[in-house]
């Protein structure tokens, strides 16, 4: 069983996201440890990028703060090397194709394998272009995780059939951020996914409260939260890891019911 599969093996998964380097890499490391200790099943790590097109203002701000504080792809790799000494849950990078290309795709993926990264999410990579990365991901044992936005049944089925790791279901069209309510018919999307793959699926974009997380994991196999965690970093700065740990515990308790 892959490391990512284990995250979903014993019940519903809670998946937090954090932008590496906001406000600094030391705080990111402490936050990763706090999330893992408080029940996170898998953590998405954002590699900062100057033009994060899928992100709303909260995560865009985190990217800019991280870059201004000196975060680089190499420094993020070093951070993962350090936390991997004692964090065993799956870690997945979420970044943009340009970050991987500019680093050198093979060099990027071989480093991911070396430091213990289990998967890669590239929100700006269209399904039709995934073969630019898929062979290298397979070569280095890194799952290329696909995103499914509200779209036609045929397209959902096509993406689901080739799913690796887990499927990231986008709760609504648009950018990331917290929402008061999610109106997309997610149950219909999940139904098509499950008819076409045994790969687990998690819902992200717009989840911030325990009630929303419980509702989403009533439909899918996991809930993904980013903006709400970034807001804690914005509010508490270097003191945020303790707050993040408490938040993750509340969210994990909610998804496990």
What does each model-found stretch correspond to?
Residues 14-18, 43-45, 91-95, 120-122, ...:
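Hydrophobic faces of well-ordered beta-strands that scaffold small-molecule active sites
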